[in-house]
Amino acid sequence: MTIGVIISTYNNPAWLEKTLWGYLCQDRMADEIIIADDGSGEETRMLIERYKKLLPIKHVWHEDDGFRKTVILNKAIVAATADYLVFTDQDCVPRHDFLAVHNLMAKKGFFLSGGYFKLPLSISKALQEEDVRD
């Protein structure tokens, strides 16, 4: 089974990068990562271009015309080729086993939902790549 991850983002490359660090450290790597971009600017585009060298990323973008997250998510779904899709946001850093657990628990015809642990903002801001790797 192939796994695709759809990450929604809007104008926050610092948070998006922290999330991408997590996808570099997966026990079971994503077959595709689609960044559903609700109209971010040049800084986000440049970050995504940098990470395309490290991860199988597709950047699905539309012009900023207000909050249209659902529209860009639908476009990302259309762009996806994976058998199984995981949806997340730019500020959700996955555990190293996040995709491996999805791979283990996925069953045809079922929807799998999970939770998250919300870190205090001060800790989230201080999070560095080595924290995610370790």
Residue locations for each model-derived region?
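Short beta-strand/loop segment that forms part of the nucleotide-sugar
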Residues: 30-39, 60-62
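Conserved donor-nucleotide/metal-binding helix-loop-beta segment in metal-dependent transferases, i.e.
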Residues: 99-117
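Short beta-strand-to-loop element that shapes/binds the nucleotide-sugar donor at the catalytic cleft/hinge
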Residues: 112-130
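Glycine-rich, basic loop-to-helix element that forms the pyrophosphate-binding segment
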Residues: 63-80, 97
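Cell-envelope/extracellular polymer assembly enzymes that use nucleotide-activated donors
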Residues: 2-4, 32
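Short, acidic, metal-binding catalytic loop of nucleotide-sugar glycosyltransferases
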Residues: 21-30
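Short aromatic/hydrophobic "clamp" motif used to bind/position activated sugar donors
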Residues: 85
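A conserved acidic beta->alpha catalytic loop
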Residues: 37-46, 92
